[in-house]
Amino acid sequence: MFTTRTGTQRVDLIRSSLQENGVHSSAHLIGRISRGEMVRVRRGVYLPTQAWAEAPPWARYRIAICAAAMTQDLIFCRDSALVLHGIPLLSTPPAIFARTANPGEAKTHAPPQMTGRVPLQQFLRRYSESHPEAAPLRTAHLSNFPTKRLEPARPKNISRPEHRAQLRSGTFSIPEVRLTSGALEAVAGPAQGYRAEPLGLAALDAASRMSFTEAVVVLDAVKARDDAAPVPWLPYLGTKRQQAHWRRAWGFADAGAESALESESRVVLAQISCPAPTLQKVVRTSIGDFRMDFCWERERVAGEVDGRAKYFEPQYTNGADPAEVHYREKRRREALEAEGWQLVRWGKAELRNRQELVKRLGRAGLRPIST
């Protein structure tokens, strides 16, 4: 039901409205909620239950951003702005982040109950009855994202009261850019598009509050872009801790990383004292040239971080089935070994079980010294 990294069709959210016959569609949509067929993402914005249930968490987050934009004129910031700018995140954020010039609105706003007035267990039962072929719907599937409204970011040399006065007088306006309605791959956006903070400000404001690994995932991607320009926003880093955290993460970031898993791998490799690898090196073999995620030329070791997508998602497999992909990978490994390279593979499990990663690298001749 949605355009994702798997190439399936985008979600189209349904907005309740007054019909040509003078009847408002909300009554019909609420009736579909009562039968377990629809969920309410935001007030007046609906989606077929099965589409929401089958969407992965990252896609649900994007659907919620779109629904929020359809119902309120929001300027998205921090993690939400990064998503709109196409920057990967290590994990799905817990809330939608948006600015407000009204201090009274600067708080977390609970989302609507996705099942409307229908009790949750009753909704689950009705969905199961109307979708016997679908995977079971669970309570966790019906968790929605709140909207966290934040006062505008400000330079550290301007106090909050001064900044509020500037907003009231019109001498300062919230920084923003306009993004197209197609900014989110998971969902067809509102016709007017989205309002979001500039990428440089969003990256700086979000990354300075993230863990080091989360920040590197963001900043690797930001460094690969030519439209980020975070330097003009450096005065917006409010505390010395944020400034130090930003400098460390920005200094470590590398535009050569091409996925969140590669960025996370770079952090873990550094933490286990592995020699710094070369990123995206092209290795020539008898059957062709291969670009490797990580290379250690002196040790003749190549590293590849594999997610499930590499074997199952069409944009990576070019339509081949998993067995064919595995066969290609076998030939690739053999060709690399014939040129004197050892290939080490790892995925999410090994990044979270560092002892296993250390063993794999050690067997290939690398000597990380800590776990």
How should these model regions be labeled?
Residues F2, T6, V23-H24, K223-T371:
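Surface segments flanking catalytic/ligand-binding clefts of nucleic-acid enzymes
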Residues M1-Q242, I369-T371:
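Short gly/ser-rich loop at a beta-strand->alpha-helix junction or flexible surface loop bordering the NTP-binding
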